[in-house]
Amino acid sequence: TVATSFQSSFNGVKETNNNNDRRVIGVEYTTPPIDVAYYFGISVNVPVLKLTRQTYVDEKPVTHYETYINPIVPVDEKTDFSGSMYAKLEQAGYPITHVKEKITATLMSTKQKELFQIAKKNEAIMNRTRMGSSNDLPIEYTYSQYVANGYELVIDLK
């Protein structure tokens, strides 16, 4: 395994849509995966809000996001998440002030090829795990998958 890590600081987090076609696929309460429950400091039996979104290019999904939101945040399944999730969290009183991310790349599994409507062999996917907190309080945990062919990740820390 080859790994690279870096640490830096930034002034908040915000999403820019850049005219992307980002769609909310679902908003529901569910039991969290164990790593999400551990990050939030809750039992895996405590339901959390799960937000599923996808970004489309030419009517095909190129990014899949599954975000879990800490139950302390006053949002629910009726909240409109069609805009920026970070703006919504800030409006709820929990601006994201710190982010930790893990980024890996692998070949697509059969399930991922179905999700992204890919028929080719040996297609790459980038997996990204992001944990966001507000003043050291864990707020969101997101699993993201990106079709890696031609994908560029730009991190602009200020």
Where are the regions a protein language model picked out?
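Broad gene-expression machinery/nucleic-acid interaction feature
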Residues: 24, 48-50, 64, 125-127, ...
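A short, well-structured catalytic beta-strand-centered motif of the EAL phosphodiesterase domain
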Residues: 41, 66-69, 143-146
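Bacterial carbohydrate/catabolite-sensing allosteric modules
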Residues: 19, 60, 137
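HTH-adjacent hinge/linker in prokaryotic transcriptional regulators
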Residues: 1-45, 66, 74-100, 104, ...
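A short glycine-rich, His/Asp/Glu-containing loop-to-beta-strand
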Residues: 22-23, 50-51, 56-57, 61-66, ...
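Short, solvent-exposed beta-strand/turn "edge" segments of beta-rich domains on protein surfaces
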Residues: 39-45, 56, 117-121
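C-terminal regulatory/effector modules of DNA-binding transcriptional regulators
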Residues: 72, 79-80, 87-158
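A short beta-strand signature
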Residues: 44-58, 125-132
